[in-house]
Amino acid sequence: MAKTLLFIVNPRAGRTRSMGPLFEAVAHFGQEGYLVSVRQTTHPGHAAELAEAEGARYDRIVCCGGDGTLNETVSGLMRLPDPPPLGYIPGGSTNDFAASLELSPDPAQTARRITASQGRALDVGSFNGRPFVYVASFGAFTRASYSAPQSIKNDLGHLAYLLEGVKDLSTLRPY
């Protein structure tokens, strides 16, 4: 029986707007013996919904998007009693998590690494019942990471967060 892989893609994430490189990744998974099902997210929270609803039926899950897509996918998988292994292809505007693991921004190269690797365990934190894999934040500039418009993040990367944070400077109060 063929191995199965659910490929969750956020088409709105920074670099995933060009699907050509993603086709190479899907082709690689197929060459490695996986029957691949591709699902594109359509709204915030959709990656979590897909991972939870469909994840148990697959041998492996791979998500492609930014840090938010990864976090959503992990959130959905954490609701399963026995989640399958997860691979991550960075496709967001800043990809902080991928940079911390030295993952390639090239989808085909990362796909090869996913299939060649035995994987590694990563810690998953939880705050108020919400899982996270990279960052849990609070404080003065937390809003900036959620409020920066996607189009600006796509164009400016990390600078978009800085510009969004400047908007809050006048509202800061000393403690």
Annotate each language-model stretch with its function:
Residues 10, 67, 142-144:
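A residue-level signal for conserved active-site and pocket-lining positions in enzyme catalytic cores
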Residues 45-46, 68, 139:
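Short alpha-helical
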Residues 69-81:
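Short Gly/Thr/Asp-enriched flexible loops that form oxyanion-binding sites at enzyme active sites
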Residues 1-64:
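ATP/NTP phosphate-donor binding region
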Residues 19-21, 74-77, 99-101:
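Short amphipathic alpha-helical segments
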Residues 45-50, 74, 120, 163-164:
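A generic local structural motif
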Residues 32, 41, 79-175:
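Catalytic core of DAGKc-family lipid kinases
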Residues 25, 47, 73, 97-98, ...:
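Hydrophobic packing residues within well-ordered alpha-helices of enzyme cores
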